[in-house]
Swiss-Prot record:
Main location: cytoplasm
Gene name of this polypeptide: ybeY
EC number: 3.1.-.-
Protein name per its UniProtKB record: Endoribonuclease YbeY
Naturally occurring in which organism (per UniProt): Syntrophomonas wolfei subsp. wolfei (strain DSM 2245B / Goettingen)
GO molecular function ontology, one term from the record: metalloendopeptidase activity
Length: 156
């Protein structure tokens, strides 16, 4: 899987360790759900003001959020499993407020890298069709997130 990362903010120091966490989590999710190696993911690192604008435009919420996901395609499980030579499966875009991630990491008492990894896992699962609209969906999604975090050694 190819993961493209763009840091669009300069309020928080974006480190090589953070970049590696994003790549590790993206690859762990891809492996767990058996995504084709031809899959592409885009991750944009932004600040609170940028994600607040997106949150207002796309969700009608006039406040900064931690992560937003924009699926490129709504694929069925069978379509995600297809590995056609030369065909690229563009999963979509994840936008993360690094400013929000750092503040949440302080609030929750863990590292910024762990919070960033969790937000990438959460965003990717949304791109793959998982949601948390009811308790059953929420429990499934949380279980997958914790398995991913365990796999990349970023447990709580």
């Amino acid at each position: 899987m190819e993961t493209m990362i763009i840091n669009q903010q300069n309020k928080i120091n974006y480190t090589k360790e953070m970049q590696q966490v994003i790549l590790n989590v993206a690859n762990a999710v891809a492996k767990m759900v058996k995504l084709s190696p031809n899959t592409e993911l885009s991750v944009m690192i932004v600040d609170n003001s940028y994600i607040k604008e997106l949150n207002l435009i796309y969700r009608g919420e006039n406040n900064p959020t931690d992560v937003l996901s924009f699926a490129m395609n709504e694929l069925s499980e069978e379509e995600m499993d297809l590995d056609l030579p030369g065909e690229v499966n563009v999963l979509g875009d994840i936008v993360v407020s690094l400013e929000k991630a750092v503040s949440q990491s302080e609030e929750y008492g863990h590292s910024a890298e762990r919070e960033l990894g969790y937000l990438i896992a959460h965003g990717m699962l949304h791109l793959l069709g998982y949601d948390h609209e009811n308790e059953e969906e929420r429990n499934l999604m949380r279980n997958l997130e914790e398995r991913i975090m365990h796999k990349v050694k970023l447990e709580r």
